[in-house]
Curated annotation (Swiss-Prot):
The uncleaved transit peptide is required for mitochondrial targeting and proper membrane integration. Optimum pH is 8.0. The gene is DHODH. GO terms for molecular function: dihydroorotate dehydrogenase (quinone) activity; dihydroorotate dehydrogenase activity. This is Dihydroorotate dehydrogenase (quinone), mitochondrial. SUPFAM superfamilies: FMN-linked oxidoreductases. NCBIfam families: PRK05286.1-2, PRK05286.2-5, pyrD_sub2. Binds 1 FMN per subunit. It comes from Bos taurus (Bovine).
Length: 395
């Protein structure tokens, strides 16, 4: 009898402890505890789910508003005015997370100062065969070869038009929307693909991105060559200028980190010559640093995350110098902390983006980056984030 009572009490205790643990974990999930997400929840999810399934679920949960809202309140010192718009804070989500414009509002609630969707291609396409996304947890990195999988312009246009008035209010409130454009795999005239993207989605964007730097579409990076780039961007600008909208979107070009010195000079020359509004620096890299530890490090595709950080920052530094600081730069590649963000800003970026860090640290990383950035700005004597833009070039 005594044994049965003891066993029953033990079972009751386990239920109470288990239920309490579940409630506590639920509380930490809902409140967006940074350490809980980075050290327990995200690693556990990665053990359970393959990378692409995890990505799809993350987009779905974000679209349904099932992820924690940010608790960080943006201060005035984080505000940036660039590309013809106010940005409440300089930390955005890079293209690649919300490829089809399904989760825009949820991403703003996560605390991002701007959202960039895409890449969007004119016609729907499946992209490359699976598996096409690979984690390198030892390196805090991802290799992907998605290959511009896209729902196509028509579907994305319909999706964005349904929330057009909502976006207009968000933009006015300092939360702009960017749309990243790509070309179809089988297209023979890339310029026509990008021009069509401008015609269809330009009226719905605060800025457009001409993505000529993905390593996962054959021949795409050749569009970064001087003559090809000039021809392409001339056509894109003509289409943008012809849009019948009150506020025409800015046009930015997203470039690769794997460029020669001559490539960078040529891009800077064309951008300045044509009056391109900005650069996004950089896309993922095809290089594989010797420091990589992940078992899947040799998989083909673009490498993003921590191993890209310094290469991206150096490319920002060079492009800022080549454009004399007159072309706004969005810095992306390996941002997972306020220190990473500030290094890119000091190198010349007006805004920064992250993505891979979100897969390893979860939604709380957004508030963490902003909080750390604000503290570092104060520590280094900057009254506003805009005072830090290009600071390394003024030493």
């Amino acid at each position: 009898m005594a044994w049965r009572q003891l066993k029953k009490r033990a079972q009751d205790a386990m239920v109470i402890l288990g239920g309490g643990g579940l409630l506590f974990a639920s509380y930490l999930t809902a409140t967006g505890d940074e350490h809980f997400y980075a050290e327990l929840l995200m690693p556990s999810l990665q053990r359970l789910l393959d990378p692409e399934t995890a990505h799809r679920l993350a987009v779905r949960f974000t679209s349904l508003g099932l992820l924690p809202r940010t608790t960080f309140q943006d201060s005035d010192m984080l505000e940036v005015r660039v590309l013809g718009h106010k940005f409440r804070n300089p930390v955005g989500i890079a293209a690649g997370f919300d490829k089809h414009g399904e989760a825009v509002d949820g991403l703003y609630k996560m605390g991002f100062g701007f959202v960039e969707i895409g890449s969007v291609t004119p016609e729907p396409q499946e992209g490359n065969p699976r598996p096409r996304v690979f984690r390198l947890p030892e390196d805090q990195a991802i290799i992907n070869r998605y290959g511009f999988n896209s729902h196509g312009l028509s579907v994305v246009e319909h999706r964005l038009r349904a929330r057009q008035q909502t976006q207009a209010r968000l933009t006015e409130d300092g939360l702009p929307l960017g749309i990243n454009l790509g070309k179809n795999k089988t297209s023979v005239d890339a310029a026509s693909d990008y021009a069509e993207g401008v015609r269809v989605l330009g009226p719905l964007a605060d800025y457009l991105v001409v993505n000529v730097s993905s390593p996962n579409t054959a021949g795409l990076r050749s569009l970064q060559g001087k003559a090809e780039l000039r021809r392409l961007l001339t056509k894109v600008l003509q289409e943008r200028d012809a849009l019948k909208v009150a506020h025409k979107p800015a046009v930015l070009v997203k470039i690769a980190p794997d460029l020669t010195a001559q490539d960078k000079e040529d891009i800077a020359s064309v951008v300045r010559e044509l009056g391109i509004d900005g650069l996004i620096v950089t896309n993922s890299t095809v290089s594989r640093p010797a420091s990589l530890q992940g078992a899947l490090r040799s998989e083909p595709g673009g490498l993003s995350g921590k191993p890209l950080r310094d290469l991206s920052t150096q490319t920002i530094r060079e492009m800022y110098a080549l454009t004399q600081g007159r072309v706004p730069i969005v810095g992306v590649g390996g941002v997972s902390s306020g220190q990473d963000a500030l290094e890119k800003i000091r190198a010349g970026a007006s805004l920064v983006q992250l993505y891979t860090a979100l897969t390893y640290r979860g939604p709380p990383v957004v508030g963490g980056v902003k909080r750390e950035l604000e503290a570092l700005l104060k520590e280094q004597g900057f009254a506003r984030v805009t005072d830090a833009i290009g600071a390394d070039h003024r030493r």
